[in-house]
Amino acid sequence: MKVIEGVIPAPQAKIAIVVSRFNSFINDRLVEGALDTLKRQGQIADENITLVKVPGAVELPLAAKRLAKSKQFDGIVALGCVIRGGTAHFEYVSGECAKGLAQVALEAEIPVAFGVLTTENIEQAIERAGTKAGNKGVEAALSTLEMINVMNALGA
């Protein structure tokens, strides 16, 4: 039986990180985790990483699509944080963001990792940005690296 499974190191890969500025005190921690992972575990040099900042989570898919269409990147790490408030806005923002990023990955056929926190409150967001529940930026970077290698193994 042939098994195709990705590995983490991808030293030649070119990665874009697109991050929302809204809730930057959380997102900055996600970026730190992703960058550390890409450099240490992915063995990717600084010059092969591009960081793009957008206003909010709704803008992540459009920026990711433009990055993917440029054909300059092997994978995209999308990072952000949407915290539930007192209105239905949370559902619209988180749903459209997730759907848009998935669509970019499918259309461009490159990995687009969903590292957008969707939490009930600020405490949950803090926990997932490097404290009690790990750092989801790290997880998104690892997923991107592994999927780059899986896609390369699968061929054109």
Swiss-Prot record:
Domain of life: Bacteria
Subunit structure comment from the entry: Forms an icosahedral capsid composed of 60 subunits, arranged as a dodecamer of pentamers.
Name this polypeptide is given: 6,7-dimethyl-8-ribityllumazine synthase
Catalytically driven reaction(s): (2S)-2-hydroxy-3-oxobutyl phosphate + 5-amino-6-(D-ribitylamino)uracil = 6,7-dimethyl-8-(1-D-ribityl)lumazine + phosphate + 2 H2O + H(+)
Originating gene: ribH
Lineage of source species: Bacteria, Pseudomonadati, Pseudomonadota, Gammaproteobacteria, Aeromonadales
Annotated positions binding (2S)-2-hydroxy-3-oxobutyl phosphate: 86-87, 128
GO biological process, one term: riboflavin biosynthetic process
Record-linked Pfam families: DMRL_synthase
Keywords, sorted A to Z: Riboflavin biosynthesis, Transferase
SUPFAM superfamilies: Lumazine synthase
NCBIfam families documented for this protein: lumazine-synth, PRK00061.1-4
Function: Catalyzes the formation of 6,7-dimethyl-8-ribityllumazine by condensation of 5-amino-6-(D-ribitylamino)uracil with 3,4-dihydroxy-2-butanone 4-phosphate. This is the penultimate step in the biosynthesis of riboflavin.
Organism: Tolumonas auensis (strain DSM 9187 / NBRC 110442 / TA 4)
HAMAP family documented for this protein: Lumazine_synth
Molecular-function annotations in GO: 6,7-dimethyl-8-ribityllumazine synthase activity
GO CC term, one of those recorded: cytosol
Pathway assignment: Cofactor biosynthesis; riboflavin biosynthesis; riboflavin from 2-hydroxy-3-oxobutyl phosphate and 5-amino-6-(D-ribitylamino)uracil: step 1/2
E.C. no: 2.5.1.78
